């Protein structure tokens, strides 16, 4: 219970600071830099060597691809029939196909399922969601904004991302028997800064700017992201014999609210950023309710 309370406190604190305390310029970028380049790699280096790799670990990764691929198919077909612009369609594919599997996923999964669940959440995020963002996400952003995707740039972005490098190192170290205890004592406290800082950063960036023509598109998007996508992932896991904590974490990661980085990508490619940020803000708030409820339904 105290872990869940920490999530709400950090999120609300960030929102209050952004509104009333006039934080220094660049604070969000500074926090995000630390989270992505220091805290997240440290967490990966701590947890991945402890993961027991078994055949079911394909599921959390596949769930991330299914969520994105389903969003691309659904909104790609739905957009023209509802008269959406290509920019609107691209924005919904990005923000409703990619979940907040790190900033929200890590702390929520850890609060609900402890370190074993967190290790699986890292697998879903680093082997699933991040490669989807850096590859298929860039392709969608390019296609729907009228730009040409650059495969070499995509490959370099994945290969040089600090947490991905840490993931590769962590897998090798795990195969060799794990870290010496002395190093574990270094990685753990650095990685522990991710949860409070990530949620504080989300609170600082929280935005809610609905327009009267956005509600329909936002409803379609969030209906997919928070309900249909996790349901399809659960069906996939059930029919393929996946169970236990692997199934639960995979489905919950698929059910996470929209990814902050996806909204940033939509903004960079001019894919209706106002809609993207509205869906992001509403989705984050709703997921704080739907994730615990989904966990109960899954028997967590």
Describe every region a protein language model picked out.
Residues 1-300:
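Alpha-helical transmembrane segments of multi-pass small-molecule/ion transporters
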């Amino acid at each position: 219970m105290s872990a869940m309370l920490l999530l709400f406190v950090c999120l609300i604190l960030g929102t209050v600071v952004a509104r009333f305390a006039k934080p220094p310029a660049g604070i969000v970028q500074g926090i995000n830099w630390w989270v992505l380049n220091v805290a997240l790699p440290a967490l990966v280096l701590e947890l991945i060597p402890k993961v027991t790799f078994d055949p079911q670990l394909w599921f959390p990764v596949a769930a991330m691809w299914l969520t994105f691929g389903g969003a691309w198919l659904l909104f790609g077909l739905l957009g023209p029939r509802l008269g959406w612009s290509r920019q609107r369609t691209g924005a919904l594919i990005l923000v409703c196909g990619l979940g907040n599997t790190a900033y929200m996923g890590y702390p929520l999964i850890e609060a609900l399922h402890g370190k074993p669940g967190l290790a699986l959440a890292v697998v879903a995020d680093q082997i699933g969601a991040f490669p989807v963002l850096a590859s298929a996400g860039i392709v969608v952003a390019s296609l729907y904004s009228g730009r040409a995707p650059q495969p070499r740039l995509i490959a370099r972005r994945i290969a040089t991302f600090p947490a991905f490098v840490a993931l590769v190192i962590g897998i090798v170290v795990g195969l060799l028997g794990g870290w010496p205890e002395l190093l574990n004592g270094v990685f753990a406290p650095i990685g522990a800064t991710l949860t409070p800082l990530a949620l504080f950063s989300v609170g600082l960036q929280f935005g809610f700017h609905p327009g009267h023509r956005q509600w329909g598109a936002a409803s379609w998007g969030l209906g997919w992201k928070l309900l249909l996508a996790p349901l399809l992932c659960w069906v996939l896991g059930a029919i393929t014999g996946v169970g236990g904590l692997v199934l639960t974490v995979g489905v919950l990661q698929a059910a996470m609210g929209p990814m902050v980085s996806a909204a940033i990508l939509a903004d960079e490619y001019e894919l209706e950023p106002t809609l993207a940020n509205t869906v992001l803000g509403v989705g984050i708030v709703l997921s704080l309710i739907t994730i615990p409820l989904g966990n109960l339904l899954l028997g967590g």
